[in-house]
Amino acid sequence: MNQTIQRCYLLCYVLVSSLLIPNIATAQISSDGTLSTTVNSDDGLNFLIESGVRTNDHLFHSFSEFSVPSNGSAFFNNAGDIVNIFSRVTGGNISNIDGLIRANGNANLFLINPAGIIFGNNASLAIGGSFFATTAESVVFGNGMEFSATEPNQAPLLTINITPGLQMGTNPGNITVNGPGETLNGSIFRSFDRSNLGSQLQVEPGNTLALVGGDISLRGGLLSAEGGQIEIAAVGSNNSRAMVPLTPVGSGWDLDLSQVSNLGNIQLTQSALLDTSGDTAGSIRLRGATITVGDNSIVLTQNEGSQNAGNTILHGTETVTIGENDANGSINTFVANLTRSSGDGGDLEIITKNFNLFGGANLLLNTFGEGAPGKMNIIASESVDMIGFSPDNQSTFTSNLNSLTFSKAKAGDITISTNQLRLALADIVGWTLGEGDGGNITLNARESIEIVGLISGVNGGDTVVSAASLGKGNGGSVKVNTARLWLQDGAGIGASAFGKGDAGTVTINASESVTLLDTLANRFTTTNISSRVGRPIPIFRTLFGLDPIPTANAGEITINTSELTISGDPDSQDAQIRVRNEGFGDGGELVIKADTINLNYGASIASSTFSGQGGDITLDIKNSLRLRNRSTITAEAGTDQEADNNGDGGNITINSNLVTLMEGSLINANANQGNGENISITTQRLFGRDRAITASSEFGVDGEISINNADTPANGLIELPTELRDRTQEIAKGCRWTDTSSFYITGRGGIPQDPSAMVRGGQILSDVRDISDLSIVRAIPETFDSKPEKTKAPIVEANAWIINEQGNLELVAVVNSSQALDFLRATCAIKED
């Protein structure tokens, strides 16, 4: 009785287990009997697969189950001249492969199981050709013949066309690769050491390793195809049996997903690795709806030979995410296409709607050898978000998008095209650290670009978009095209140089606005747009052999926008747009075209040099220029007074309808030993206190200040006389005089014909003429009353304003018309009684 009950319990357990864990095959391989495939095993671990159906140089096998146990093997004992082995699994159970798959010769192996495929930690390959693991329903050939895993009893394969395609089902199974994970020894400034690289799923050089299924996950999985291709394609459900054509490319294959309307998800976690590096580096292509590379995983193509490398492409129709935006960060997560020899590197391309770079993750396009790198191109139709990582709010790790050259080769260009671009604790860098020129950076965002340097409560870190030279090569340029550009709290856009190579240019085209804003009190950071030649820090001087004082020239900054706003904070560093040279070279030019420019709280537009010629500043403003609260526009040369500084200061040219300088704001063009350069302001209205505009030199010749009224015509102006006229013939006798009084006249117009006349509005510019023939009004009395006439000033309402000597706004009154006549009486004659 007890045995009967135990047997019932056991039977129930088996039934329940089969319901709870469906479609997981046991570790075995068996033929389904539809083809002449034979499977033999002496120990239940190692399986010998023979026979099958041969058509020309293609071999077909059919299995009801196909799973390889741990430390076991599946050996396809094919003839050496077989080109392709097609293996289907028809039993409806997932293939669980945790051992070795072998084949003879150079045959390509296709493993087809619509139910799904799982590779374990011990899975490995020993085949001479390419390997395809797919959850497609069938392989369809060009002549219409189909090798189906869902309808295995179709007509026999008598003749086939060599060009196959994968017929995907409406709900393809998933593919998972579990593995030990691999953390390579590499960084932003160093190539990856692959000498102790582990292996899992690996094909011979030049071949293709492809996973084509529903959702595809690599959890520590290692995929390697030296000089070949890694193709991962996640095909989603509801595709109406879409076809994926396969095209031979060299010894590998290319997949065409143009007929697939719905894609699945691809995820790399737990230090997963995709690697096509080697003496001939290959290509990597990931395609899905969402693609995630995180948890210290790496996608790597590193060219170590003389042939050119292939491209790295991540195409996610919805989202591509590199790194993880959580407390753990992803500082060892990389997507990299590198070259360390004479062969050129490939391109790194990301195509998606939304691209995210999180947690200190890195996109690299570096060259360490003579070979030129490719280009980095990010196309995200909706948004690009790059956010760094601060594990303890003390230290920070920026998310990095880098193109670096350490050799004679030019660094690769970086281009981002999107609708909205947002950066926080993240860097976009194109640098040269060798003899080659730096790469160019182009940011295209239809709507807006927002760059935030520091985050409140987090110490350290910043955000920069930087093209720089730390060697002999010239730095690259930065170009920004958007509607609105916003930089805040230590964010920077710059082209820099620290050695012999010149700094590049910075060009900003923002149709609506450019805003630079500092809100955090932090004396180490400044929000800025700059072209700078700086002095290298000691560690850079040691690493790259740099001189303590550079000889490079600064580049030019050009900004075109409707509204430019630069604002610091009363307790913070000052936001600024600057061209600066701390070495022996010259400063670059700074050109801004805008409708309005507003500077506040110590904001500055500046050009300065240590020794060379100062750069010019040109502001072409349609409406108004306003400087408030100690803001400045300066052009300086020879900032180090102890050095032999002979550079002249740069010119400042301002064209604006209105110019306002308030609350201690200044416009200066100064030099040390060189000459102070000129300041030219053309405006209809200029408001500011005395001495707010200077052009000087410490030891050289001061510059000139020219303030022109845009409405004053230059035609007809003549030179004024320098000598006084004969006053006896210019003023009629009879003028009243008092003690210590004097009256001088110079010029050619602007006074009445005789002292009895009155100056009215229409007569202000009357000519001076000889009055020797005019009669005398009457003699002046010998005595007079020296007491001034007391007239009580009327009290009237204020109806106008002026800027007083302190620079403050003061309300004043204009008198009525009857009183105005007395105010306008410009005569020194005595009235007749």
Task: Label each PLM-derived region with a short phrase.
Residues 2-833:
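Extracellular and secretory-pathway beta-repeat/beta-biased strand scaffolds
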